[in-house]
């Protein structure tokens, strides 16, 4: 027998160290993980055997067995699935092979209490064995191959891989040498109860040996949960199935179990989590819904089964219409799959709309977890944008609560036809923004957009049900004439511009290229000034984001809007009428203040500081 001793990857070492020293109370999840792995191994071979039935020759009935050897203090889990060769053992058990495990590592904090909680939130798979075992031995023979390999480790930094000359049929056997302090897992009644609780949804039959190690007792019905009538499935069974798919400890918020009959036949069992999924904004944006064809697992990767913005869904879809021998490549552009995707999307959005209307508090929690992902769909050309906008909610500046666009429209002021919003990073800062003070003073609501994606989708969706969606930073907003005709607005605007031409010209002359234009504001009520952009220009926050991402080089010059009713602006105007043009420092300070309020950089921080100090000094001396 040839042996190779290898060191675990550093990342695996971190996980093993945590498993060995774990204080996590729910250690029984190691059985959930090992049973799930065994089931996956059977599913993989079942799929491969569709195109190569010699892989299951002589042993086509898949099963998993669990056995306790009390004399040796061992638990043995055996399957006749796809098995592993030497390379598979090294890759799967010696390195980080799962994105879920990699994400587990990223979330480690060094705080033993917090890190132990993570064990229950992430699927750490095979490595969870070391919570209860001080030695693990894996014997495996890959389907279609003759050689048998053994992997063994005490979890302390190294493992041994060797070839075995012993007779061993296809599949994998895992032997756990149970720690003395965890010997309660060697109790037949307890382990049987644990296995049963984690196996009822597994489509592979699971057998448990009796206390004498002889006769096998089947613990599960071995029928896919989603194929059973809903009335025969308990809430606990749904919950356990969800947890086996999601590797989380939360319960599902919504369960959607439907059988679709007609032109396209499929069954879906989908769950919306009650807690935010750890990989929601991972760069690869993976979707976690498994595709089955006639109860045979096909894939859960690289298939367009649900839109990316619904990637928080967990569950399975089982199709009756797709051929079992379909290639992974053919799934990329498949008309049947497209119809299934459209039907699921429609069903999920309808359920979300129902929940939004019936359980607003619960929906708010859902939205805080997954609203950012949902709004990504508004940027996709294939989305039914209106249906998606119907389930979106936003913070209302006027009412300080989350409301839908339909609720906003229902509360329009008489004659109002526009939905106003303001985007930024912090809702509290947005509430104090001069951009919306005039609108709020007239009881015209403003929606507060605080997700980065908001700045993108509003560029694609400029209206909703015939109502324009407009940023409060636009120059053409007139709070006094919100409900007036465009002709009245133009007349009043021209009158104001003519009346204050002396003032606006002075600001333009003083600020030069720092501003695109200077106008009299129709939306400010108390603040002296604010930055604004024209109807065709990019929103201020969107531009700032693109600069940060190096998509554009420099910020564009903005309009500066002045409030002639403000005492400071009024003083400058009166001085100008008296031919006093000695307020240039004050003009620059007003502009700098407007930039700061919008999160824009001040052109010259040194000059800004000097101006501020000079004005404060003058104020003190005048006391």
UniProtKB/Swiss-Prot annotation:
Protein name: Chaperone protein HtpG
Entry keyword Chaperone: yes
Keyword annotations of the record: ATP-binding, Chaperone, Cytoplasm, Nucleotide-binding, Stress response
GO cellular component, one term: cytoplasm
Function: Molecular chaperone. Has ATPase activity.
Lineage: Bacteria, Pseudomonadati, Pseudomonadota, Alphaproteobacteria, Rickettsiales
CDD domains recorded: HATPase_Hsp90-like
Cytoplasm found in the keyword field: yes
């Amino acid at each position: 027998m040839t042996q190779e001793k290898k060191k675990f990857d550093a990342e695996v070492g971190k996980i093993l160290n945590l498993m060995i020293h774990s204080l996590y109370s729910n250690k029984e999840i190691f059985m959930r993980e090992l049973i799930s792995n065994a089931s996956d191994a059977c599913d993989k071979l079942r799929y491969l055997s569709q195109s190569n039935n010699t892989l299951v020759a002589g042993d086509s009935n898949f099963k998993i067995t669990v056995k306790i050897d009390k004399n040796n203090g061992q638990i043995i889990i055996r399957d006749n699935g796809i098995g592993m060769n030497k390379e598979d053992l090294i890759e799967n058990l010696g390195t980080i092979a799962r994105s879920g495990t990699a994400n587990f590592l990223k979330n480690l904090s060094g705080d033993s209490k917090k890190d132990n909680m993570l064990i229950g939130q992430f699927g750490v798979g095979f490595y969870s064995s070391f919570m209860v075992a001080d030695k693990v031995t894996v014997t495996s023979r890959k389907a279609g191959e003759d050689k048998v390999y053994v992997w063994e480790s005490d979890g302390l930094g190294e493992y041994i891989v060797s070839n075995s000359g012993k007779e061993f049929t296809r599949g994998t056997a895992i032997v756990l040498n149970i720690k003395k302090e965890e010997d309660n897992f060697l109790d037949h009644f307890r382990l049987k109860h644990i296995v049963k609780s984690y196996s009822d949804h597994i489509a592979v039959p699971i057998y448990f040996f009796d206390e004498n190690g002889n006769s096998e007792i089947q613990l599960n019905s071995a029928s896919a949960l989603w194929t059973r009538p809903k009335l025969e499935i308990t809430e606990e069974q749904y919950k356990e199935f969800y947890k086996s798919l999601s590797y989380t400890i939360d319960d599902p918020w919504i369960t959607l179990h439907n059988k679709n009959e007609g032109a396209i036949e499929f069954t879906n069992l989908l769950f919306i989590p009650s807690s935010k999924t750890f990989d929601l904004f991972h760069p690869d944006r993976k979707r976690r819904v498994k595709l089955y064809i006639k109860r045979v697992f096909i894939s859960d990767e690289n298939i367009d089964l649900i839109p990316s913005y619904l990637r928080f869904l967990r569950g399975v879809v089982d199709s009756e219409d797709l051929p079992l021998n379909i290639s992974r490549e053919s799934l990329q552009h498949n008309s049947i799959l497209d119809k299934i995707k459209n039907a699921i999307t429609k069903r999920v959005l309808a359920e979300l709309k129902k929940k939004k209307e019936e359980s607003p508090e619960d929906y708010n929690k859902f939205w805080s977890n997954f609203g950012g992902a949902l709004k990504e769909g508004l940027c996709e050309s294939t989305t039914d944008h209106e249906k998606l906008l119907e389930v979106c909610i936003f913070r209302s500046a006027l009412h300080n609560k989350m409301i839908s666009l339909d609720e906003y429209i229902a509360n329009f002021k008489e004659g109002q036809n526009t939905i106003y919003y303001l985007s930024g990073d912090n809702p509290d800062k947005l509430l104090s923004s001069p951009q919306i003070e005039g609108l709020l003073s007239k009881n015209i609501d403003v929606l507060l957009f605080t997700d980065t994606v908001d700045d993108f989708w509003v560029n694609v969706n400029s209206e909703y049900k015939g109502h324009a969606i407009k940023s409060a930073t636009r120059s053409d907003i007139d709070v006094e004439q919100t409900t007036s005709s465009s002709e009245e607005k133009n007349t009043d605007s021209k009158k104001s511009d003519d009346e204050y031409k002396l003032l606006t010209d002075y600001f333009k002359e003083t600020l030069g290229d720092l501003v695109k234009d200077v106008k009299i504001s129709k939306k400010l009520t108390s603040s002296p000034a604010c930055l604004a952009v024209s109807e065709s220009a990019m929103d201020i926050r969107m531009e700032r984001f693109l600069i940060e991402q190096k998509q554009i080089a420099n910020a564009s010059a903005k309009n500066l809007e002045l409030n002639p009713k403000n005492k400071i602006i009024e003083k400058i105007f009166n001085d100008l009428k008296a031919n006093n043009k000695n307020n240039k420092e004050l003009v620059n300070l007003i502009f700098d203040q407007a930039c700061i309020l919008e999160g824009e950089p001040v052109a010259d921080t040194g000059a800004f500081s000097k101006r501020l100090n000079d004005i404060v000094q003058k104020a003190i001396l005048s006391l």
